[in-house]
Amino acid sequence: MASGTFVSRGLGLVRNVLLVAAIGTTGLVADAFDVANKIPNVLFAILAGGVLNAVLVPQIVRAYRARNTQERLDKLLTLSGVILLALSALLTAGSSILVALYTGPGWTAPQTSLAVAFAFWCTPQLFFYGLYTLLGQVLNARGQFGPFMWAPVLNNVVSIAGFAAFIALYGPAVTGNVDDLTQWDGTKIALLAGTATLGVAAQALILVVPLWRAGFRWHLRFGLHGIGLRSAGQVALWTFAAVILEQVGVLFTTRFASEAPRAALAQTFGAYRDDPGTLGAVTGLVTGAPDAFSGALAVAGNAAYTQALMIYLLPHSLVTVSIATALFTGMSAAAHAGDLARVRHDLSRGVRTVGVFTVFATAVLVVLALPVTKLLVPSVDAASGEAVSMVLRAMALGLVPLGGMVLMKWVYYAFEDGRTVFWIQVPGTLVLVGVSWLGTQLLPPQLWVVGIGLAMSLSNLVAVGLRTVGLRRTLHGLDGARILRLHVKAGLAALVSAVAGWGVLRAFVVLSGDPADGIYGLSWWQSVVVVAVAGTVMGLVYAGGLKLMRVRELDQLAGPIVGRVRRLVRR
């Protein structure tokens, strides 16, 4: 699973590089597309993602233990598919309303219209994300985890081809006219946004192949009787409410982030919203003198936030999601059987193994934020790279609690306990929105999105703390001493490795001969060298520290990788 995720994320980075090359990371079009492409992801999380994970997996596990397995699966998949299709059609028709929810009053009419056009093409992704989850969970319940993790590879291949075609036809963002909104006709919009949706469709439909080969046939079968939804109704409602609450936080932070560039520009250049013409002063500055104003225009907004979030989630998706997916089906079965010891053991093992990786990943992202940003987003300029990297550092502080938070949430789902998930989400959302809003009041607009990143980290910490308290009661203990001891040891090793990585960065600044510019002016190739050298040094120091402190979880995490490398060498 991790190897599939690794390849997928690698191609995802290539996809992202081409997207940034096409429309940039800051500016009118970048923010408009980011809002539109975020909508189906948010909608899926609200309307399907959480409910499907909370309800579908336990019911599929039960279906495979029942005598009428095929009938139950057919009814579950048919009901879910019909609901997804109807919601997708309805929400696509309401694209303009959705865009209005996620944008602030500072958006001009032309930019809002462009975002609505993008959203009309992007919102149907909701159906295909749902279909991907439905088919993938059937495969997972059968013990076939690989296809679910490899399917996004096809998504990225399709997107890479489409974005490359866009650049070939219309040129890259660096030509300086990407934010000329009068140039965005229907064909140009369809190629960019339609490519994103086509990739998600391919990701979902490819899962039909492994299911067919495994002998599974899905027949349309309507009906609610005998599929366990009566027992799942409560958890579905509570989970739905929890996800709604979570996405309220996303709604507010998106609006805060969308206003940051305009607030910074108004602060620097004065009022511009009522300027005559279709482009406005912001576009005039970008197209007329992009070099002169690049520093002032490179204020982190929605697009920069998304770039930082993409990098931040790489270690999470590579390790945490893979481990959680592998453990969830077994934990659901153990919870159904009342085997608390098995659930407690699996959760402890998952949190400790994930912690070994996320503690180190936090150190790397904090120390190497700027070179990592320039490595993974090669087309970003110096000012935009600095804006993204500052947000990334703030987010990275919440990476460790994020891993534990996700694993613990899935334990609640295994017990079909949506009520507790909801009530724990309340203070988490309040912290996220409250601290983000406080940042807009106390910080300059250039740092609003950094404040959102810090708020997100603090929210993760609050959520994992509350879930720990709740699960300690549910499982009659959490193996807390071992978990805490592991994280303390990993934290000490990561601190030493961070100092070593910082030393490598300082050495590079001295050797570069330009202390004034230093890391800020790194080229892509220099970023490759810095990340490779500093990352290797940090990794060796970290692994050495864990070995000295006899942290066995390192072997559990690295064992499969080492074993595969050895087999390849022997061949």
Give, region by region, the residue ranges found by the protein language model:
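Membrane-embedded alpha-helical bundles of multi-pass transporters/translocases
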Residues: M1-R571
